Regions:
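A glycine-rich beta-turn/hairpin centered on an aromatic-Pro dipeptide
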Residues: 175-219
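Acidic/His-leaning functional-site neighborhoods
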Residues: 211-236, 240
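Structural signal for well-ordered, non-membrane alpha-helices
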Residues: 20, 24, 28, 54-58, ...
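An N-terminal domain-cap segment
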Residues: 2-48, 57
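Short, contiguous alpha-helical
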Residues: 32-77, 131-189
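Short, helix-capping/interhelical loops that line the mouth of catalytic, cofactor-
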Residues: 1-9, 56-120
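Acidic interhelical loop/turn segments
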Residues: 24-36, 112-142
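C-terminal interaction segments
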Residues: 229-283
Length: 283
């Protein structure tokens, strides 16, 4: 049975509160803030980016004005496509030079707690402006914040030789509370960027453990989410949602989980999954 928006709302709020505590504790215990965490970012840079996410998402969620140092990036964020989000990230990280992990832990926790406080009277279905001017349910903005804390918490922990696990239930909330609403939002195709080449639809049935089955249909107009049974499927994917989220963010390779049976792919055109994953992107 698919969870109602109010159920997602309460569960995401609880998970976000727990995760920001865990993330802040991790940051306060960092031994080498200059260690490489992801791409060219150090642990300190990654934490500064998470602060940016907390600031921008709390601003969108509450309808308040951003802090002055984030004003330019906030205005830019309203106009970008997904391929231009990296420019927003770069501006934010440059505009806010704090790199002390303990200080960043406090700033991130303060912002997430403020977001939870200011949205306590909402039910999660309210539409708010987000990246690229998309209108998303409030639940999805908090869901994106949860995703960033979990994915980048894992980046930071791995740089220190530690673990920062993502629970199956948390990943389920991210898929159902953030990704699927993002893909079905008005003008989601525009936010997804230019697709110059026409393409045949890629139809994928996604079977995530603990989630209802959904069908993702990608073509030159974007990606939509459908109920199963409406059209022939090219490729079926079965996986744990936490593992699938890390695959989609290129945090783990597909070969190992596939050989271990943690990810199963089958169907009449399984090779088309690669094209779908190129199109199903989340900031």
């Amino acid at each position: 049975m698919r969870a109602t928006p109010s159920t997602h709302w309460l569960d995401i709020r609880t998970s976000l509160e727990d995760t920001v505590d865990r993330f802040s504790t991790l940051l306060r215990s960092v031994e080498n803030r200059d260690a490489r965490a992801v791409g060219t970012w150090s642990i300190a840079d990654t934490a500064a980016h998470v602060r940016e996410v907390a600031v921008l998402n709390s601003t969108w969620a509450s309808g308040a004005a951003p802090p002055p140092e984030f004003r330019v990036a906030f205005d830019l964020a309203a106009t970008v496509s997904i391929d231009e989000v990296s420019e927003v990230n770069a501006r934010c990280v440059a505009a806010a030079p704090e790199r002390d992990p303990c200080a960043l832990a406090a700033l991130i926790q303060e912002r997430v707690e403020l977001m939870l406080y200011l949205t306590a009277g909402a039910d999660g279905t309210e539409l708010v402006s987000w990246l690229g001017g998309l209108k998303l349910p409030l639940t999805s903005v908090l869901g994106h914040t949860l995703s960033e804390l979990l994915v980048h918490g894992r980046d930071i922990a791995r740089a220190e030789g530690r673990a920062f696990p993502i629970a199956q239930g948390q990943a389920k909330l991210i898929f159902e509370g953030f990704l699927f609403p993002l893909l079905t939002a008005a003008d989601a195709a525009g936010f997804g960027g230019e697709r110059t080449d026409a393409m045949r639809p890629v139809v994928c049935e996604l079977r995530l453990k603990g989630c209802d089955r959904v069908v993702l249909v990608a073509d030159s107009g974007g990606v939509v989410v459908e109920e199963p049974g409406g059209r022939p499927v090219d490729v079926h994917v079965a996986a744990d949602p936490a593992l699938m989220w890390l695959l989609m963010f290129n945090r783990i390779g597909a070969l190992g989980p596939t050989l271990r049976g943690q990810v199963k792919v089958w169907g009449r055109r399984p090779w088309r999954l690669r094209r779908l994953l190129q199109l199903v992107k989340a900031p």
